[in-house]
Amino acid sequence: MTRVAGIDPGTVSFDVCGLDDGEVVLERSFETAAVGADPGILVAALAEHGPFELVYGPAGYGLPLVEASEVGERELELIVLVREDEPSGPMGVGGMRAIVRALIAAELPLVFGPGAIHLPTIPAYRKWNRIDLGTADKVASAALCIADQARRLDIGIAETSFVMLEVGGAFSAALAVDGGRIVDGLGGSSGPVGARACGAMDGEVAYLLGSALSKRTIFSGGGMGPALEEGAAKAALSLTVSVPAPREILVAGRHAPDVLEPLAARLPYPVRHVENAAARGAAILADGLAGGNYTPLVERLRLREASGTVLDHVRLHGAERIRLR
């Protein structure tokens, strides 16, 4: 019997899921702004339904399975990725550092999981000059999708294959899963346009923005309608290079219902909706790490072999001058 929880740190909402021996015992959602202003509401929700053997914490861009006791200032910097010279003001997931610190101070049994770029299942050449192949919550979403497809189609984890599109409240992202493993990805800041975020940026636009380019820029310039729909379709099709015969396109995230019909019309694969993917996926990963029912899934993902930092593969001119705070 394992009792675990997972947290999805979204731009719009923080979602929490608790599992007891694989059964859902907690599902709560809080506005991100409210959690940023008072992380205690998140801590209280977890304490009310605890104790937990393990809590899969909010890791932003990801850490290679780091326990709470090992999280220092450098790890916090890598979670949020804010430049040393970034102007002060609201940006990204507001109060993320304070939220993580509050969870750690509450002495919860936390672990902070990897982003896609930390995983050994993605070849190094696909990581070239990339940071965001999918944040830690996208890895969690993919875990839920693997479990979901295996159950629905009555197949083994190693037989699952799909492209997951997460069309969230701000960002859109995509991950390729083949043989039950994450093999490629397009993260929210390097993929299709999102509802509130620009996605992959034209290099010339970045150059011309110059000193005006900030974290707030990445969280701006999004669009709905055809821009969101076609961008998601292009992302899914581009990842079929890495997973040539996906069984399905699985769509998660706040705006998934808005794009299901347009995607089904554009894509030559079955398109299905998956709900509450990131929070439930985080809880599934916690369960597997704690030795529960989802241990084979964690082993298949090679989660314990995650390594490095999100900065390891950046080889651009000027990268040596990157400084975080």
Segments (PLM) and residue ranges:
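Gly/Thr-rich phosphate-binding beta-strand-loop-beta motif of the actin/hexokinase/Hsp70
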Residues: 1-27, 160-187
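Phosphate/pyrophosphate-binding loops at sites that engage ATP/ADP/AMP, CoA/4′-phosphopantetheine
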Residues: 44-54, 152-156, 233-248
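Adenine-nucleotide phosphate-binding core of ATP-dependent small-molecule kinases
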Residues: 212-250
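Glycine-rich phosphate-binding loops at beta-strand->alpha-helix junctions
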Residues: 245-263
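Short beta-strand-loop/turn "lid" adjacent to the catalytic site in phosphate-handling enzymes
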Residues: 51-130
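N-terminal glycine/serine-rich phosphate-binding loop of ATP-dependent small-molecule kinases
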Residues: 1-70, 105-106
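Glycine-rich phosphate-binding/hydrolytic loop that grips phosphoryl groups
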Residues: 262, 268-325
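Glycine-rich phosphate-binding loop plus the immediately following alpha-helix
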Residues: 127, 131-156, 179-224
